[in-house]
């Protein structure tokens, strides 16, 4: 499936589905979950998905994810053995922001493909397979291999989607902790950017593709800037009701008055953009405040959890004009340090809790004597 088909499949707020955005039926109260202990001691959970009840491992170890949500599984603490979270422009590789997190997983295709190689899936010996409605026609065949659950795709609220998916795998606490950490990080980065570049400075991001401009408003890159980081939108944004990725021509783009522009596209599309007279007249272009980014991976990066997190970390380097590849290296280093700090804090908290419990036990024992 081409990137144009992906964009054509979802232009409205309700219809646009990023490669890594899901909402399971649990969000609407249509999925039920019940833990069940077998006589042999094996722990399972019963999930009622769009196709009926499925008994799945309580702690799956070999997940094959075809739904495009392997990044969510990663933040829940699962390592997938097979994935369809491939690059939107090259299905044989991972998007750059997922290379480290999905290292070792086998790429089985792209999440918008309705069929994938069943033999390749079998070879991975999965104990749980996760699909979206896109792959529904494979459901019965996959169910004969191992427990398979189908996640219904929709865009409602990405944070609720994360929690709903976490509920399926009984890891809501991890999802909540990650979301709280991300929200705090994005807000802090927004404050840092506003302090350095001005409270009222405005930012615009768009994808140039085939002579059309897809404006990231309430989706992707734009959602990260406006909703997560709290940066200001420019005047002249296209008003298209219930559309999160509005499409404009060059004249429509030139009507948007932004202080900074993030132009995303292939080399060919960016060349055509730079040759456009209306684009050349934009204030940000004339001021030299344009950051050009490759379509792979930045078209999709603002949709998934890890992509969003990485983009927030990259932002100060990108806006300063650093090469995107170098910005990613520095961002990943920053993220590794953040993770280490969090782990150290968690360890200290557990140690303090343990000491408090020991003290309480000692005091109780003393009173008993």
Model segments located where?
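Structured C-terminal subdomain patch of bacterial secreted/periplasmic proteins
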Residues: 123, 140, 256-369
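Proline-aspartate-enriched helix->loop->beta-strand connector
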Residues: 118, 122-131, 147, 258-259
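A short, structured surface patch at a secondary-structure boundary
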Residues: 66-120
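N-terminal secretory signal peptides
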Residues: 1-11, 15-31
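Basic- and aromatic-lined ligand-binding clefts that recognize polyanionic substrates
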Residues: 62-76, 177-232
């Amino acid at each position: 499936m081409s990137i144009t088909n992906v964009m054509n499949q979802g232009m409205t707020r309700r219809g646009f589905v990023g490669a890594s955005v899901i909402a399971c039926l649990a969000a609407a109260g249509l999925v039920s979950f019940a833990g069940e202990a077998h006589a042999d001691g094996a722990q399972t959970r019963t999930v009622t998905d769009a196709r009926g009840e499925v008994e799945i491992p309580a702690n799956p170890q070999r997940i094959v994810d075809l739904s495009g949500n392997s990044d969510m599984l990663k933040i829940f603490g699962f390592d997938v053995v097979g994935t369809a979270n491939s690059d939107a422009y090259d299905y044989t590789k991972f998007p750059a922001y997922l290379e480290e997190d999905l290292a070792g997983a086998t790429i089985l295709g792209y999440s918008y493909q309705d069929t994938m190689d069943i033999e390749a899936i079998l070879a991975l010996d999965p104990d749980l397979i996760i699909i979206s409605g896109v792959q529904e026609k494979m459901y019965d065949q996959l169910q004969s291999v191992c427990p398979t659950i189908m996640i219904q795709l929709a865009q409602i609220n990405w944070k609720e989607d994360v929690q709903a998916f976490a509920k399926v795998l009984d890891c809501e606490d991890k999802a909540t902790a990650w979301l709280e950490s991300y929200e705090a990080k994005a807000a802090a980065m927004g404050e840092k950017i506003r302090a350095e570049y001005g409270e009222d400075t405005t930012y615009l991001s768009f994808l140039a593709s085939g002579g059309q401009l897809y404006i990231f408003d309430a989706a992707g890159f734009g959602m990260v800037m406006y909703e997560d980081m709290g940066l200001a939108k420019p005047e002249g944004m296209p008003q298209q009701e219930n559309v999160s990725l509005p499409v404009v021509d060059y004249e429509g783009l030139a009507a948007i008055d932004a202080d900074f522009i993030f132009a995303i596209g292939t080399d060919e599309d960016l060349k055509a953009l730079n040759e456009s007279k209306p684009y050349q007249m934009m204030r940000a272009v004339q001021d030299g405040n344009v950051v050009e980014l490759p379509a792979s991976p930045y078209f999709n990066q603002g949709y998934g959890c890890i992509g969003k997190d990485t983009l927030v970390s990259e932002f100060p380097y990108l806006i300063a004009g650093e090469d995107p590849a170098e910005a990613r290296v520095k961002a990943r280093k920053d993220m590794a340090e953040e993770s280490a700090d969090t782990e150290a804090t968690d360890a200290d908290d557990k140690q303090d809790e343990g000491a408090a419990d020991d003290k309480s036990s000692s005091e109780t024992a003393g009173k008993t004597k």
